[in-house]
């Protein structure tokens, strides 16, 4: 087996080249962010203080086809835009930042925000949005 997955090299390498603040890239398949990525509308609405932090700050990549080869990597990098978080439809998330600490902070608190939203949805009613 190869030491490093070539799709990971493609995705991370392309993002490092195209996104100036992407000194650190974290990619996970965390439980609640992945659940959010599987929803028909994966946008995270502002329903509490954690979700408000990420309102309109998350890019969504709906074209994820399963493997990040060169063309897919270019599309993903372009989808990040000015966001620090990219939600990959039916897959998980990427966070990008100038430091490991910043990338992890976004990763950790985004997962907490997703947990709140997914838990609220499990009540079977739409959560009340915070008026912004």
Regions found by a protein language model. Give the residues of each.
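Glycine-rich flexible loops
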Residues: 1-132
């Amino acid at each position: 087996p190869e030491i490093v997955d070539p799709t990971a090299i493609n995705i991370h390498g392309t993002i490092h080249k195209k996104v100036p603040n992407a000194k650190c890239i974290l990619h996970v398949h965390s439980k609640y962010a992945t659940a959010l990525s599987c929803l028909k509308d994966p946008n995270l609405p502002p329903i509490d203080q954690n979700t408000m932090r990420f309102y309109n700050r998350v890019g969504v990549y709906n074209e994820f086809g399963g493997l990040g080869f060169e063309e897919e990597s270019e599309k993903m990098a372009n989808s990040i835009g000015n966001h620090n978080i990219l939600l990959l439809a039916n897959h998980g998330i990427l966070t990008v930042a100038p430091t490991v600490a910043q990338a992890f902070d976004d990763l950790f608190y985004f997962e907490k925000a997703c947990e709140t939203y997914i838990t609220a949805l499990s009540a079977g009613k739409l959560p009340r949005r915070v008026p912004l």
